[in-house]
Amino acid sequence: MISILLLIAAQSASTRLPPARALPPPTGDEQAVLNSANALLSAFNTGNPVEVLRWVYPDGRVTGTGTLPSRSGVRSESWAQFTQRLGNSAFQETISDPAVEVDGDAAMVWAPFVVRIGGKVSNCGFDHFDLVRENGIWKTMNLTFSSRITRCPAQ
């Protein structure tokens, strides 16, 4: 019986992954990355398609998964398609407690968000911005988010 347990333990030990390597040390660009993501959110909140397109790469995508008040599942569209739906000044999205990672000219922001429409919580989830720096300017390539209509803060 003990030999069987030792054999099982040996097999499970051999399938473990090696420890993850730590990310490079912070470069000091985290605030610039966060400023870019916040500028994009500000453009969403004012419903300004021109300003949104200023902070993104046109070839990027907006992809959502989960539940919204009107639909569920995976949704994906270009930034141009996304901006065509802007204009509702009652829409307000906020993020909190962002995690920012930077490696050279690539970065990401991961943060919980809450969307309010007319001051009432509509949905919440997590945003994942992936950003690229070109000519010293951080722009969002893609925004991917989860969404739910229950268990949201202040709901």
Predicted segment positions?
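Sec-dependent N-terminal signal peptides of Gram-negative exported proteins
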Residues: M1-A13
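N-terminal, post-signal-peptide region of Sec/Tat-exported proteins
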Residues: S42-Q81
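Short beta-strand edge/turn micro-motifs at domain boundaries
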Residues: L17, M108, C124-R151
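Surface-exposed, charged secondary-structure patches
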Residues: A32, R61, G73-S122
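Short, low-complexity N-terminal intrinsically disordered segments enriched in polar/charged residues
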Residues: Q11-V50, R54, P58
